[in-house]
């Protein structure tokens, strides 16, 4: 496209009177060719007997051999892959969130913004994944449910670490992992450390905002609670965004993340209601009612309340 006011170059088919006399256009580069040598892959490496292939790099043999249905039901494969892929996405979300946390601790906020944005996009991917599982009907799930035993997503240790890292702490949630000392150690370490939001509150203090001492050093195993001094700091940021642009951007990245996380939770509960109604969950929870209670959890309370205060 030519900028406004500039003449099109000679020979351009859109240049008015010259259009009728312009030379025929060259064949498009993407047009299909029937010549094998021109297919675009003739120089590609085809022998991987002595080098690493795509499958080798991704350990596809291990990944694709990790689905072991216990029932004869066709739909169990969907159920397994849905949860396995969700665990892979959560692994990446944890990786990015911990990287962002390290960046915030050193006041390197631009890299943290990039990582937080990626976590939000991961959560959007997880939201869309429920659409695939929702193709399973109650009848189909009932056929395979007896084979699941007491296994449940409630027991996902990666999901629990994600909740803890985002500030929704609960000491009792260690118990489902007591039979795996290695896993228990990981989950406990996340429980006992400051959450991502705790580190952001410390960042506010480093930037000169008067945050209450008891908020900066507290029992990290407890969930995030609303704090007036934190809200006052965010109020100042939102009233003068140009003066506190990095903090303003951090606030919006966090709201974006929690927004996506809420959508993921909502799609979770609606998918459960659609498939099993209000039956008890396989892990012993109340099922949909338990998940609905989780919709009321607020991860970053001051960032939501400050919108009313403004």
From Swiss-Prot:
Annotated EC: 1.13.11.11
Region (Disordered): 1-36
Pathway: Amino-acid degradation; L-tryptophan degradation via kynurenine pathway; L-kynurenine from L-tryptophan: step 1/2
Cofactor detail note: Binds 1 heme group per subunit.
Keyword Oxidoreductase: yes
Entry GO MF terms: heme binding; metal ion binding; tryptophan 2,3-dioxygenase activity
Entry binding sites for substrate: 79-83, 141, 145, 282
Family stated for the protein in its record: Belongs to the tryptophan 2,3-dioxygenase family.
Name by which UniProt lists this protein: Tryptophan 2,3-dioxygenase
Annotated source species: Burkholderia lata (strain ATCC 17760 / DSM 23089 / LMG 22485 / NCIMB 9086 / R18194 / 383)
């Amino acid at each position: 496209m030519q900028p406004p006011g500039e003449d099109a170059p000679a020979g351009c088919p859109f240049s008015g009177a010259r259009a009728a006399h312009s030379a025929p256009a060259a064949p498009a580069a993407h047009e299909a060719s029937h010549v094998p040598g021109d297919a675009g892959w003739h120089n590609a490496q085809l022998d991987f007997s002595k080098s690493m292939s795509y499958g080798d790099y991704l350990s596809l043999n291990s990944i694709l051999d990790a689905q072991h249905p216990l029932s004869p039901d066709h739909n169990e494969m969907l159920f397994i892959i849905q949860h396995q892929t969700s665990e892979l996405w959560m692994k990446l979300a944890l990786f990015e969130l911990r990287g962002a946390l390290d960046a915030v601790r050193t006041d390197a906020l631009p890299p943290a913004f990039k990582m937080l944005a990626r976590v939000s996009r991961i959560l959007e991917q997880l939201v869309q994944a429920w659409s695939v599982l929702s193709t399973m009907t109650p009848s189909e799930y009932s056929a395979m449910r007896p084979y699941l035993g007491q296994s449940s997503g409630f027991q996902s240790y990666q999901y629990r670490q994600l909740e803890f890292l985002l500030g929704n702490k609960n000491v009792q949630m260690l118990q489902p992992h007591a039979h795996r000392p290695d896993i228990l150690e990981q989950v406990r370490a996340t429980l006992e450390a400051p959450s991502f939001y705790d580190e952001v509150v410390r960042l506010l203090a480093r930037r000169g905002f008067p945050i209450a001492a008891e908020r900066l050093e507290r029992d990290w195993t407890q969930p995030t609670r609303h704090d007036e001094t934190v809200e006052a700091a965010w109020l100042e940021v939102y009233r003068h965004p140009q003066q506190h642009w990095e903090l303003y951007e951090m606030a919006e990245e966090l709201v974006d993340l929690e927004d996506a996380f809420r959508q993921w939770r909502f799609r979770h509960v609606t998918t459960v209601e659609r498939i099993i109604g209000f039956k008890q969950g396989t892990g012993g929870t109340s099922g949909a009612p338990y998940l609905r209670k989780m919709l009321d959890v607020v991860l970053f309370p001051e960032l939501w309340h400050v919108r009313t205060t403004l």
